[in-house]
Amino acid sequence: MATEKVFFHVDIDAFFASVEQLDNPEYMGKPVIVGGQSERGVVSTCSYEARKFGVHSAMPILQARKLCPSGIFLRGRMDRYHEKSKEVMSIFKDFTPEIKQISVDEAFLNMTGMEKIFGTPKNSALLLKKTIKEETGLTVSVGCAQNKYIAKIASGRSKPDGLFIVKAGEEIDFMKSLPLKDVWGVGGKTRERLIAAGLTSVPQIFNSSEHLLQSILGNASGSFLFQAVRGELYDVFSDDVKSHSISTERTFEHDLFSHAEIDDVMFYLASELMYRIFDEKVKGKTVSVKIRYNDFTTVSVQSTGAVVNDTQDLFERARELFYKKFDNKTPIRLLGLCIMNIESDIPEAQTELFYSEKNVKKRKIEETMYTLTKKEGKNILKPARLLKKDKDGLE
């Protein structure tokens, strides 16, 4: 008899804002809004106190100030957030060797077979939550199910500091209980098309044929939704590469389309990946970009070249790949960036064999920035583009 699969999706609650409240106790219980502070800035993350005023991520800062004039508005400290993220991710390793980090504040844990060590999924999830709270001061919400897609949705059903378990055989009932807006992957435009066709609830969609859904949404989106409402999506979050890789991605509450916004997000993803590259003392030559449109069509593109040298190098390569693949007409729901075929970095004495003198200097400067930041735990140095984005863009 096959072992029943168990997956956790763990999401750090209001991560950036929670770190700010943790580091500044006077902010506890108050509306904290992290994001760019200029007229063009947008909200990255806000505390649950701020959400009561209607503030949400990707909202223009000016609008957030109008909704929540008493809010505490802060620029992001990405290096500090990475530090706290690493603390949480290291705790995961004490619970399972199979971890897939999908962003700075969320990850999937394959807990299959771990009941022999930690007991039932409920017991292990409660222990995980307790350990994270005690060791980092942060709270997490956990979704538990037989596949990653259901676990992802479940983690959002009892936020903050929640635990929601969907037992085997309960997937369809769980999906039918959801408001249409809570079906992961179904954005505003998709909902509009479904409602226009008379499909306003998950049970109605469940009772529709795959052919009908494809006629409304297109083949890819129709098939996706047909499987989603049945809880049968087993590969949405499967590993895209078999070899060792380091990746990050971001799903947006509101779809992206402008090139300026896309470039800003791409640079942040590149910065996050290089931070992890330096931290793990590895290198890679293959860059991959993933695009998920708001109709849930997903495309990816990759290329192999010289060893990725620094954040700017990674950003330029990723940006070139992105615009080769982007259809320039469909809003984007998710962006992902990956460095593949990772291997241990070469000894410093051999570096000059693989990098030009200019690139060696650039890489060493960025490694020094990372080392100082890690040592001091604050933004001592950072790339000029990130300084600009502290003022203007998405954190």
Curated annotation (Swiss-Prot):
Database matches in HAMAP family: DNApol_IV
Active site: 106
Cofactors: Mg(2+)
Site residues, Substrate discrimination: 16
EC supergroup of this enzyme: transferase
Residue ranges of every copy of the UmuC domain listed in the record: 7-187
InterPro entries found in the cross-reference section: DNA/RNA_pol_sf, DNA_pol_Y-fam_lit_finger_sf, DNA_pol_Y-fam_little_finger, DNA_polymerase-Y, DNApol_IV, PolY_HhH_motif, Rev_trsase/Diguanyl_cyclase, UmuC
Principal location listed in the UniProt entry: cytoplasm
One Gene Ontology cellular component annotation held by this UniProt entry: cytosol
Record EC number: 2.7.7.7
Protein name: DNA polymerase IV
Function text: Poorly processive, error-prone DNA polymerase involved in untargeted mutagenesis. Copies undamaged DNA at stalled replication forks, which arise in vivo from mismatched or misaligned primer ends. These misaligned primers can be extended by PolIV. Exhibits no 3'-5' exonuclease (proofreading) activity. May be involved in translesional synthesis, in conjunction with the beta clamp from PolIII.
Manner of cofactor binding, per the entry note: Binds 2 magnesium ions per subunit.
Compartments it resides in: Cytoplasm
Family: Belongs to the DNA polymerase type-Y family.
Record's keyword annotation contains DNA repair: yes
Entry keywords, A to Z: Cytoplasm, DNA damage, DNA repair, DNA replication, DNA-binding, DNA-directed DNA polymerase, Magnesium, Metal-binding, Mutator protein, Nucleotidyltransferase, Transferase
GO molecular function: damaged DNA binding; DNA-directed DNA polymerase activity; magnesium ion binding
Reactions mediated catalytically: DNA(n) + a 2'-deoxyribonucleoside 5'-triphosphate = DNA(n+1) + diphosphate
Quaternary structure (record): Monomer.
SUPFAM superfamilies named in the record: DNA/RNA polymerases, Lesion bypass DNA polymerase (Y-family), little finger domain
Residues binding Mg(2+): 11, 105
Biological processes per GO annotation: DNA-templated DNA replication; error-prone translesion synthesis; SOS response
CDD domains reported in the protein's UniProt record: PolY_Pol_IV_kappa
Gene3D superfamilies with a match to the protein in the record: 3.30.70.270, 3.40.1170.60, 5' to 3' exonuclease, C-terminal subdomain, DNA polymerase, Y-family, little finger domain
